[in-house]
Design a protein with these regions (language model features):
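A short structural micro-motif
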Residues: 43, 62-65, 181
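Short, flexible micro-motifs
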Residues: 38, 53-56, 71, 169
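Alpha-helical transmembrane segments and their immediate interhelical/interface regions
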Residues: 15-19, 57-66
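Helix-loop junctions on the outward
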Residues: 29-30, 42-60
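Membrane-water interface of transmembrane alpha-helices
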Residues: 60-79
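A broadly tuned "polar low-complexity/structure-edge" signature
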Residues: 36, 44-46, 73
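Polytopic alpha-helical membrane-helix bundles and their juxtamembrane interface segments
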Residues: 1-27, 31, 38, 75-79, ...
Length: 194
């Protein structure tokens, strides 16, 4: 019983995370509803384990999920007929450099905040995953297929971090996320051609 009382939030957010990734894999707009609830709960989980960057990122995810839902529901790409959801597309090459610059600035800023204002024991990796997650979530909201590449990297590093920090269910979830992100890329690629 001690195990469950110690890990109940980890278990709950892991279940929600499984639902989220299945919905993302299917390119279902319902992913954004789960994407509001899960990170709201993750905020407390991460904070209680000293993953302050991840806690801050979870707050961002909660807010960004509202944006993602609105873009998927009401946004349209150039040339798309009115109505329907936004199609899956490639990230325009003109956005590569700005995305890389944003990532680098976000990584440096997050690292500085974690080192200066927290007692984080993993500031470099925590900041890295947070900065890349900003870019990944933006790419997901725009329905760019390349978002999967960002998540493969983020998920692999987070799996390691959660093992180190003693959050076993999240670690297993993020290990599974790596596999699903690889499969998701190919699924979305197939969906793009339909």
């Amino acid at each position: 019983m001690d195990f469950l009382s110690e890990h109940w939030l980890d278990i709950l957010t892991t279940i929600l995370g499984l639902l989220y990734i299945v919905l993302e894999y299917r390119a279902s707009i319902a992913l954004w509803i789960v994407g509001i609830i899960m990170p709201a709960l993750d905020t407390w989980l991460y904070w209680s384990h000293g993953l302050y960057g991840d806690a801050g990122m979870a707050v961002y995810y909660t807010i960004a999920a509202i944006y993602g839902w609105a873009v998927w529901r009401f946004g349209r790409k150039h040339g798309q007929q009115t109505g329907g959801q936004m199609p899956i597309t490639h990230m325009p090459s003109r956005l590569y450099i700005p995305s890389l610059v944003f990532f680098a600035v976000a990584w440096a800023a997050t690292y500085y905040i974690l080192v200066t204002f927290t007692d984080s024991t993993v500031p470099l990796l925590d900041a890295f995953t947070n900065a890349l997650s900003f870019v990944g979530l933006w790419a997901l909201a725009r329905k760019y297929i390349e978002q999967w590449f960002f998540w493969i990297i983020v998920d692999a590093i987070c799996c390691y971090l959660y093992i180190v920090k003693g959050i076993p269910f999240k670690a297993a979830l993020y290990g599974l996320y790596v596999v699903i992100a690889i499969a998701g890329y190919y699924k979305w690629k197939k969906m793009m051609k339909q």
